[in-house]
Amino acid sequence: MTSTRKSNPIMKMVNHAFIDLPTPSNISMWWNFGSLLATCLLLQIITGLFLAMHYSPDTSSAFSSIAHITRDVNYGWIIRYLHANGASMFFICLFLHVGRGLYYGSFLLLETWNIGILLLLTVMATAFMGYVLPWGQMSFWGATVITNLLSAIPYIGTDLVQWVWGGYSIDKPTLTRFFTIHFTLPFIIVALTTLHLLFLHETGSNNPCGIISNSDKIPFHPYYTTKDILGLTLLLLLLMMLVLFLPDLLSDPDNYTPANPLSTPPHIKPEWYFLFAYAILRSVPNKLGGVLALLLSILILMAMPMLHKSKQQSMTFRPLSQLMLWLLTTTLITLTWIGSQPVNQPFIMIGQMASMTYFTTILILMPLASLTENKLLKWT
């Protein structure tokens, strides 16, 4: 008799996706981040749902409703901090997941890669909307600065900003629509994640060697489910350490002051996971140029398949390309640090140099390193 998981229509889909899925036998812990991201998403949706039950999307009561959740709601403090720090964990896993894709050449699976970039942009939009909801000083001024970037668009910029705000300044309509969009986007992320998986399972996973592994595959369960549980345990351990011991480590103290349109904070900055893009935005003196650089800092990932000049898919056996990727990594860390600093020297100069290095590494140095390696291996 056929097993239920192979005969039941719904179970059959689950079986093909997570149980009997043929998986390369040599994929490392770097392939663990997909399941960790799914866990983070589930955690964010569950905690967000409970927070939404007590949150009030109104400028007069939003800040106090957050205080009410933290002080009065049963276990409200842990739900709130799980949601806030869960977002940080989400982005740590996202950046590592994208980094793994760059290192092992997973961007050559075009559909999967492009949907992944779309997912990254959607998650960033969701996180930005969520940062505005507590209606603290940094929420208000962060929203003001970022939404104002739309005014750089020629002809329609000002009208577009006022349309997003729902008035002539950030007020109640802005908060209401940001809450609505923040609530809706995670479900769109779930749909995109399903598409991401669908396209991945069409081609099969890449592997550390970057070679076809059809001749050596093993079922996903129990081998990789067990392996994923280890990664999940470490992720939850790190998250719970943050939530229980250092819940405000990654948040801004200014956000514990209610939003005041008449008082500007000394240094407006977004959450830590946006600082690299914020530093690139600030490094261009022209407003429109800065906005374009900001967009390109993420959208440049879409060009990776075209910039791939190596005869090998993975960087495992390409030391020059590895060096370029680590240069890119250190540049991103530098940009993150610069984004958190005030706008004065030497930070302006360091930010401009790091921004130039970021784009130069991706557009020029990485393809050049690949071509050099081809030449050295006489693969031209």
From Swiss-Prot:
Superkingdom of this protein's organism: Eukaryota
Membrane-spanning segments: 33-53, 77-98, 113-133, 178-198, 226-246, 288-308, 320-340, 347-367
Binding residues for heme b b562: H83, H182
InterPro entries per the UniProt record, alphabetical: Cyt_b/b6_C, Cyt_b/b6_C_sf, Cyt_b/b6_N, Cytb/b6-like_sf, Cytochrome_b, Cytochrome_b_C_euk/bac, Cytochrome_b_N_euk/bac, Di-haem_cyt_TM
Pfam family, one: Cytochrom_B_C
CDD domains listed in its UniProt record: cytochrome_b_C, Cytochrome_b_N
Family that this chain belongs to: Belongs to the cytochrome b family.
Record's protein name: Cytochrome b
